[in-house]
Amino acid sequence: TIVFIEYRKIRKEKKIEYLIDRIRERAEDSGNESEGDTGELAKLVEMGDFDPWVGDNL
């Protein structure tokens, strides 16, 4: 149903936001980004029509 689709979309967006925050924190602490987190983030962004750089998703 539509509710389930929206729920999955929100969960995916929250997971992406969490990974972005982790990458930022690690970059501030160590001066570089975590390879594992950036790879996982790339997989999540590629898995659907979610485009974090368009509109107010940024």
Curated annotation (Swiss-Prot):
GO terms for cellular component: host cell membrane; membrane. Its main location: host cell. Gene3D superfamilies: HIV-1 VPU cytoplasmic domain. One of its GO terms (molecular function) is CD4 receptor binding. It comes from the Viruses. The modification Phosphoserine is found at S30, S34. It holds the Pfam family Vpu. It is a single-pass type I membrane protein. InterPro entries: Vpu (IPR008187), Vpu_cyt_dom_sf (IPR009032). Phosphorylated by host CK2. This phosphorylation is necessary for interaction with human BRCP and degradation of CD4. It is found in: Host membrane. One of its GO terms (biological process) is viral release from host cell. Ion channel activity is inhibited by hexamethylene amiloride in vitro. Keywords: AIDS, Apoptosis, Host membrane, Host-virus interaction, Ion channel, Ion transport, Membrane, Phosphoprotein, Transmembrane, Transport. Enhances virion budding, by targeting human CD4 and Tetherin/BST2 to proteasome degradation. Degradation of CD4 prevents any unwanted premature interactions between viral Env and its receptor human CD4 in the endoplasmic reticulum. Degradation of antiretroviral protein Tetherin/BST2 is important for virion budding, as BST2 tethers new viral particles to the host cell membrane. Mechanistically, Vpu bridges either CD4 or BST2 to BTRC, a substrate recognition subunit of the Skp1/Cullin/F-box protein E3 ubiquitin ligase, induces their ubiquitination and subsequent proteasomal degradation. The N-terminus and transmembrane domains are required for self-oligomerization and proper virion budding, whereas the cytoplasmic domain is required for CD4 degradation. The cytoplasmic domain is composed of 2 amphipathic alpha helix that form a U-shape. HIV-1 lineages are divided in three main groups, M (for Major), O (for Outlier), and N (for New, or Non-M, Non-O). The vast majority of strains found worldwide belong to the group M. Group O seems to be endemic to and largely confined to Cameroon and neighboring countries in West Central Africa, where these viruses represent a small minority of HIV-1 strains. The group N is represented by a limited number of isolates from Cameroonian persons. The group M is further subdivided in 9 clades or subtypes (A to D, F to H, J and K). Homopentamer. Interacts with host CD4 and BRTC; these interactions induce proteasomal degradation of CD4. Interacts with host BST2; this interaction leads to the degradation of host BST2. Interacts with host FBXW11. Interacts with host AP1M1; this interaction plays a role in the mistrafficking and subsequent degradation of host BST2. Interacts with host RANBP2; this interaction allows Vpu to down-regulate host BLM sumoylation. Belongs to the HIV-1 VPU protein family. This is Protein Vpu.
